[in-house]
Amino acid sequence: MKEGKTMDKTKIIYEKVMAFKQRFPGTVAWRLKAHCKVAADHINNDEEILYAFAAQKSYSMLNIVSTFVVVITDKRILLAQKRFFFGYFYYSITPDMFNDLTIKMGLIWGMAIIDTVKETVYLSNLSSGALQEIETVISKYMMQEKRQYEQEITPEERSKLQNELRNMSKHGE
């Protein structure tokens, strides 16, 4: 049964990433199905996939071979990459580890920088048009999740945010 659930998650993630790529075709990304499969393998059954996109996990705009799939669930942010020959890379950012988000825009591509307690994650080669959507999604998600850590939020508020992120993933802003 696990294989079927993983395939469903892979399909959901892949569809969200491809919708992102269609809205922002300038984003540089390769081997998306393989990366989506790695992400799906690490999503727990009680997590809901809210948003997904692809980017290069690198500080350098010249590095175009380090594609990662970034998935936002209702509990955390996941980054996954299937290595070319064997193995994979996987990172998880929980709301309590998140510090801040920085957006940098260049002439063609931009970068989203996620600062965590342990490290700084650079997501580069993003279409400059995608930066505002990514900033909105990550900021809204993290503010809501951090608020939940500090004080209890109502189920209605949580549901409203999740619906907003789902719709943004389907249609953009």
Residue spans for each PLM region:
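The phosphoinositide-binding surface of pleckstrin homology
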Residues: 47-62, 82
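Short, compositionally biased strand/turn segments
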Residues: 64-84
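Short, flexible segments with low predicted structural confidence
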Residues: 49, 69-70, 105-106
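A generic structural signal for short beta-strands and their flanking turns/coil linkers
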Residues: 47, 73-75, 94
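Small-side-chain structural scaffolding
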Residues: 52-55, 71-73, 110
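Glycine/small-residue-rich phosphate/adenosyl-binding loop
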Residues: 44
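Acidic, Ser/Thr- and proline-rich intrinsically disordered linker/docking segments
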Residues: 2-25, 31, 38-40, 62, ...
